Curated annotation (Swiss-Prot):
Transmembrane segments: none annotated. InterPro entries: Bowman-Birk_prot_inh, Prot_inh_BBI. GO terms for cellular component: extracellular region. This is Bowman-Birk type proteinase inhibitor II-4. It comes from Triticum aestivum.
Amino acid sequence: ATRPWKCCDRAICTKSFPPMCRCMDMVEQCAATCKKCGPATSDSSRRVCEDXY
């Protein structure tokens, strides 16, 4: 899968084909290409992009 962001250190993917992935990186601000940006569960001051790709 092609990810819509430059950096994704913590990707979680399903075992389906093609796999669906989410990037679990905690960032200060989501990338402009992120459609759904939410607060990180472990640190509410950080953000996580909730888009699947």
